[in-house]
Design a protein with these regions (language model features):
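A conserved beta-strand element that flanks and buttresses the S-adenosyl-L-methionine
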Residues: 114
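Acceptor-substrate binding/catalytic loop of class I
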Residues: 146, 166-183
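Conserved alpha-helix/loop element of class I SAM-dependent methyltransferases that forms part
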Residues: 25-45
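N-terminal, positively charged/glycine-rich alpha-helical extensions of SAM-dependent methyltransferases
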Residues: 1-16
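Conserved class I S-adenosyl-L-methionine
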Residues: 143-165
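Class I SAM-dependent methyltransferase SAM/SAH-binding core
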Residues: 56-102
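A C-terminal cap/extension of S-adenosyl-L-methionine-dependent methyltransferases
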Residues: 88, 182, 186-249
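A short glycine-rich, Lys/Arg-flanked "PGG" loop and its adjoining helix->strand segment in the class I
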Residues: 126-138
Length: 249
């Protein structure tokens, strides 16, 4: 269904342990285990948290010493994210309502665009990728995760995760919007983005007390993470580009 009103209806539950929206926070350890190796040094960077929701990832980014701008369509979720940031002394985070397809920022505004649990909800993915490339500085990094459109992802993500395991609210996903890696790679390449290696991520049941966690795996047929570097002229010495290019060698 891809019902995005869910994020307004359930906004107050973003930071409630055990809620279906807070389950997304359990992905962050695996995400950062991957992305920390790509970025290397976060301190002082300007990051766009695209589709920030209630700020679950924004908080982790601020802890790494970056300045974060969080953008989301859900005003109710943005209110929760802003309130949590103020309550936890995060002066380096600001929030704005906006769409991925028409970002309200100048060209080359960010060192990093972080976009997790978002791409598979977009109705106009090409427009969003064009905007992401536009607001990135030359040599900047696009960090993402999304869901692969495979025969296995439909029953696992929609039937099992939403209806049986309760890992996501019912109606959150539409299998037709899931994205194959080669499709995303083609769009990124069209906008002068150099793609890096991707990794898979899957939920793992620990115990009735601990519940679910997420781990990095080789298999990319369900969830996958990746990154791309906005290409820069050879004469440039932009720091983020240098770190990212080292990772691709």
């Amino acid at each position: 269904m891809n019902d995005l009103t869910i994020y307004d209806t359930l906004a107050e539950s973003w930071w409630q342990a055990g809620s279906k929206l807070h389950m997304l926070a359990r992905m962050n350890p695996a995400r950062f285990a991957y992305f920390d190796t790509i970025v290397g040094h976060w301190q002082g960077l300007r990051v766009l948290d695209l589709g920030c929701g209630g700020g679950l990832t924004t908080a982790c980014l601020v802890q790494r010493g970056v300045t974060v701008v969080g953008v989301d369509l859900s005003r109710a979720s943005l209110h929760v994210a802003s309130r949590h940031g103020r309550g936890h002394g995060h002066p380096k985070s600001v929030f704005a309502c906006g769409r991925a397809e028409s970002l309200p920022f100048a060209d080359a505004s960010f060192d990093i665009v972080w976009c997790t649990d978002v791409l598979e909800h977009l109705s106009d993915l090409p427009a969003a990728i064009a905007q992401i490339a536009r607001v990135l500085k030359p040599g900047g990094l696009f960090l993402y995760d999304t869901i692969n459109r495979t025969w296995l992802s439909r029953p696992l993500v929609i039937w099992f995760w939403e209806y049986l395991a309760g890992l996501a609210p019912r109606g959150t996903h539409d299998w037709r919007l899931f994205i194959r890696p080669q499709e995303l790679r083609r769009l990124l390449t069209q906008h002068d983005m150099q793609c890096g290696a991707i990794r898979g991520m899957l939920p793992v049941w620990l115990s009735p007390r601990q519940g679910w966690c997420f781990r990095l795996v080789r298999y990319t047929g369900i969830l996958y993470l990746g990154y791309a570097v906005k290409q820069v002229e050879e004469s440039s010495s932009y720091a983020v580009s240098s770190r990212a290019e080292t990772q691709t060698r």
